[in-house]
Amino acid sequence: MTKYRIITFDGGGTLGALSLQLLNRLAYQNPKLISETNVFSGNSIGSFTALALASGRSPEETFDFFKDQILPAFSVSRPGGPVFNQQVPYSGLIKAIRTFFPRDLRLRDLKKRIVVPAFHLFAPELNRWNPVLFHNFLGSPYLNEKASDVILRSSAAPATQRAYQNYVDGYTVATNTSTASIAFAVGKAKQPLDQIAVLSIGTGEQPTQLRRDTKGWGMVSADNILPEDMEDLPPNWGVLLDRSPNEPLLPFLQIISGGSSYYESMVSSELLGDQFFRLNPRIPNFSKTDPSVVPALISIANKTNLRPAFQFIERNWN
């Protein structure tokens, strides 16, 4: 019987509705799923879910707040964003997160262990920038950090939002936090690999692809061309203004976030074998900042066959 149980949540902005509805279905079928979990981890919007559960909130309560308070923060899109301007005003998300979590709630106060990635743009003690894995395992240097600050640091996506307290989104470190969570279970909780089970919940597998010839591409233009009119900007690694429906708007950034998620799943699966389960249904190429996609995401979550996930939980959580 597996003894050390971990649930991870990917980042994905408004796509977090998919993982939250999947979680609610799983928890309804398995009432002890949350209470029997040792570690909750997540990146960006997944860090909100992870810390909400770790603080004692139910999946239903967490999803209700997401729909009622967090989604409206994404409803305002600035002109030119995310290519020429910060896309989403960050003030709405800051207010929502600080409303949900008590102002004085620290990582040391959480009822469960957590792991949350972010990227520190300047770490004075190192005199450089640095990836950070916030956690509350024994001996953590982050125990006094506010839960709300940790979530907002992990959710500050470049181009979409601004940096928060000189940190940017955890997807620059790990979109999928499965491998990091396994590492903490082994290194901090002293658990052998054969006693660890991970349920990794994504925000949807999209058909993102890039088939065109990338010869000559730079980060903001191509073939040393500086267009006089930005509407005629040639394709490049920074932005595709002439993209097809399944091509990435921001190729370089989306390669980092998408590639990281697949990589983490592959490594975690190699480490744990059948004690790792990835739940990440296929979805259309939805925007991560568009609240209008949420009803479709909920519908996809409700139609997803969860029998394999139920069987995995039955083997490892009961």
UniProtKB/Swiss-Prot annotation:
UniProt-listed GO biological process terms: lipid catabolic process
Motif (GXGXXG): 11-16
EC supergroup of this enzyme: hydrolase
Active site per UniProt: S44 (nucleophile), D169 (proton acceptor)
Motif GXSXG: positions: 42-46
UniProt-recorded Gene Ontology molecular function terms: hydrolase activity
Matches recorded under Pfam families: Patatin (PF01734)
Keywords: Hydrolase, Lipid degradation, Lipid metabolism
EC number: 3.1.1.-
All residue ranges annotated as the PNPLA domain in the record: 7-182
PANTHER family: INTRACELLLAR PHOSPHOLIPASE A FAMILY, PHOSPHOLIPASE A2
Function of the molecule: Probable lipid hydrolase.
Name assigned to this protein: Protein teg
Species for this entry: Priestia megaterium (strain ATCC 14581 / DSM 32 / CCUG 1817 / JCM 2506 / NBRC 15308 / NCIMB 9376 / NCTC 10342 / NRRL B-14308 / VKM B-512 / Ford 19) (Bacillus megaterium)
Gene: teg
